[in-house]
Amino acid sequence: MEMTNAQRLILSNQYKMMTMLDPDNAERYRRLQTIIERGYGLQMRELDREFGELTEEVCRTIINIMEMHHALQVSWTNLKDKQDLDERRLTFLGFDAATEARYLGFVRFMVHVEGRYPHFDAGTHGFNAQTKMWEKYNRMLAVWQSCPRQYHLSAVEIAQIINA
C-alpha cells in the first residue's frame, strides 16, 4: 500500500484516536499506528487485507451462493421422499479464513450486520469452513442455475448440486 507522508500522518492520528475511543482494542491500534508512522512496508501490506475490496461481481456471486444454500434447505424441507440425502450436506459452511478471508468477511457482514439469512448456522467457527470453498460453490452454483425450478428442487437435483 503506497501512501504519502500526509496520508500516513492522517491515518496515524486516526489510530491514535481509536486507541482512546476503543480501549479494548488499543494494543492493536497502537501496533498499526507504529507500522504507519515508521512505514514498515511488509506490515503495511496487512492494511491491504483490512481495506481490501470485493468487486460487485464477487459480492453478487457470494449472495447467489448463499441464496442457493437457502433454496437447497427450503427444497429439502418440502421433499416428501428425502431418499438418502443427508441434511448436513446442505448446510452453508462459509469460506476458509486463511485463504478466502474477504469472502468470509462479506458472509459475516451479510448475516450479522445486514440481517440476511438469519437461519444460517454460523457454528462454532463463525462460517469459517477451514477449507477452500470458492471453486466448489461455483460448481454447485452452475448446476443450481441450470435447474428450471430453483426453489422446488427434486431429491435428484439436490444430489446433483451438492455433488458438483
From Swiss-Prot:
| Taxonomic superkingdom | Bacteria
Question: Coiled-coil annotation: which residues?
Answer: none
Transmembrane parts of this sequence: none
Record SUPFAM superfamilies = YfbU-like
Please give the HAMAP family that the UniProt record associates with this protein: UPF0304
Q: Which family does it belong to?
A: Belongs to the UPF0304 family.
Protein name, as recorded: UPF0304 protein PC1_2778
Phylogenetic lineage:
Bacteria, Pseudomonadati, Pseudomonadota, Gammaproteobacteria, Enterobacterales
